[in-house]
């Protein structure tokens, strides 16, 4: 059997967050549930109507291009892509063919340390949505989506597996969200992935026949469909058969791709320049090019203004969290994957950073024994930052998931969370009691110290009291004591649990373990 190298390129469409559609004033509302309400004569292709460019959508695509280090075209134009389909009311789609807004660029795929080159990013209008109702025997069309601004990003064929492709798509979605240009919610169809897959023998440079898989609407579907297609093509080639150039779809239920139609080429769409829209000129340094003097009318876009609005990107935030706060890769990955959670974490960290400026009362939370020693305080600060990250990614995220809440919905402000983490680190409360305090903070928004005082949750530090409680548990559990002395370590855990129960969760398990071992020997 021959050995093949998968060669994969992606085409990713993302609906852009704008108030209105791409070429008309109809509302762009992805959450609209009533069909055919956000429409007008322009987006439904009525005779005599003229399109007007949505500048906000152009800004968004340029912002994405700059974030991905693309070359921004000085002049870009519009083209008509001609084809017939029921969800395309005009009979053509306004898109960009030979002069896209962005050319080139790259994106590093997290976890693979691999740069994937971008071929182009362009802007077009979305189609309507077909709704198939089997029980009534026909399909219906909703044009609310028709004309919505749609960004299309095309990669070079630099990917080699379904896992890589899925990771690329996830990182792109995160960038789009950080930039604020798209929610890219795949469940709502706001981001759709198409994959072009071919196989080539590892000892040859010539690429194999390309197969396109359309409209993959989840990251799992991207991974599974590509991996299936690689296997399907491998079996064909190993059996002496040819791979046909075609478009296929992904059947999630059956776990396989299915043929839809033969693959179209660009000439099948009969592209020609859009006669009703002027080209766009990208202005650099606020100055228009002299070459445009006396030329056709243009729409000017200020590149510097857009560039200045680009925030810190996910890859930059991961690196900063790792370098500045000493977080592990898995911690930074989860924190940065949710921008609101990352911002909340930063607010918690800023509390620790500011405490040394707020007087001894705050510093004593970090280092009560040596609150005058700045080096000791800094060491404690770093430990608590790491502790805070751990609790955010476990207990705090758990509460978010349990209540189906967003980070912005929490009643726990950053200052209270920071104080809570410090109290755990100092041993004022046990980890078990800390969970109860956090739940109470979640429900009420109260200060953790207030909750600890009200519920009498301060950790028992009196060794004589702990020894007394431990002896009581030993006396009342002869069977467990006997089992432990026979070598059953699980019995010790049972006894520790009983002591913790007696102290209502206010005893440190490690301290109790030491006391029990001492008393039992």
Language model feature labels by segment:
Residues 2, 143-148, 186-193, 202-205, ...:
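C-terminal non-catalytic interaction appendages of large macromolecular assemblies
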Residues 55, 144-147, 162, 166, ...:
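Conserved structured core elements
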Residues 9, 58, 169, 223, ...:
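Hydrophobic face of alpha-helices
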Residues 286-290, 294:
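Intrinsic, low-complexity polybasic segments
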Residues 1-285, 299-312, 323, 329, ...:
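Basic, nucleic-acid-interacting segments
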Residues 241-285, 298-489, 500:
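Long, charged, helix-rich clamp/arm modules that form nucleic acid-engaging surfaces
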């Amino acid at each position: 059997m021959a050995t093949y190298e998968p060669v994969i390129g992606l085409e990713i469409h993302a609906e852009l967050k704008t108030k209105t559609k791409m070429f008309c004033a109809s509302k762009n509302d992805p959450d609209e549930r009533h069909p055919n309400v956000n429409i007008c004569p322009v987006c439904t292709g009525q005779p005599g109507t003229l399109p007007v460019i949505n500048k906000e959508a152009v800004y968004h695509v340029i912002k994405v291009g700059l974030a991905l280090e693309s070359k921004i075209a000085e002049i870009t134009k519009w083209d008509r892509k001609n084809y017939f389909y029921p969800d395309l009311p005009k009979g053509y789609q306004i898109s960009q063919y030979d002069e896209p807004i962005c050319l080139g660029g790259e994106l590093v795929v997290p976890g693979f340390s691999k740069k994937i080159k971008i071929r182009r990013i362009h802007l077009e209008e979305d189609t309507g949505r077909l709704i198939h109702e089997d029980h009534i025997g026909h399909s219906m069309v909703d044009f609310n989506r028709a004309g919505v601004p749609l960004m299309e990003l095309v990669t070079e064929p630099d990917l080699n597996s379904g896992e890589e492709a899925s990771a690329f798509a996830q990182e792109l979605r995160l960038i789009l969200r950080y930039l604020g240009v798209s929610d890219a919610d795949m469940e709502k169809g706001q981001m759709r992935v198409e994959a072009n897959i071919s196989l080539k023998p590892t000892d040859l440079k010539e690429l194999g026949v390309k197969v396109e898989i359309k409209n993959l609407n989840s990251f799992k579907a991207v991974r599974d469909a590509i991996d299936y297609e690689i296997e399907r093509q491998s079996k064909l080639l190993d059996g002496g058969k040819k791979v046909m150039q075609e478009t296929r779809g992904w059947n999630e239920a059956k776990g396989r791709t299915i043929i839809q139609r033969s693959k179209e080429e660009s000439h099948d769409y009969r592209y020609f320049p859009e006669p009703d829209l002027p080209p766009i000129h990208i202005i650099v340094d606020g100055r228009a090019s002299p070459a445009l003097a006396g030329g056709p009318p243009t729409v000017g876009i200020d590149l510097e203004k857009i560039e200045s609005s680009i925030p810190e990107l996910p890859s930059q935030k991961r690196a900063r969290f790792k370098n500045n706060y000493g977080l592990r890769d898995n911690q930074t990955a989860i924190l940065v994957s949710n921008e609101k959670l990352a911002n909340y974490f930063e607010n918690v960290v800023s509390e620790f950073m500011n405490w040394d400026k707020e007087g001894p009362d705050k510093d004593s939370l970090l280092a009560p024994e040596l609150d005058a020693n700045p080096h000791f305080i800094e060491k404690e600060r770093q430990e608590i930052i790491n502790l805070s990250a751990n609790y955010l990614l476990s207990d705090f995220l758990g509460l978010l998931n349990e209540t189906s809440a967003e980070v912005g919905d929490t009643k726990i402000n950053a200052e209270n969370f920071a104080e809570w983490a410090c109290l755990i680190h100092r041993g004022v409360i046990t980890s078990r009691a800390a969970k109860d305090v956090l739940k109470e903070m979640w429900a009420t928004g109260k200060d953790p110290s207030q909750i600890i005082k009200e519920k009498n949750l301060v950790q028992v530090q009196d060794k004589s009291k702990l020894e007394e409680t431990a002896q009581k548990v030993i006396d009342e559990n002869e069977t467990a004591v006997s089992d432990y002395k026979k070598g059953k370590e699980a019995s010790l855990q049972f006894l520790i649990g009983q002591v913790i129960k007696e102290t209502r969760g206010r005893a440190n398990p490690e301290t109790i373990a030491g006391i029990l071992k001492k008393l039992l020997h």
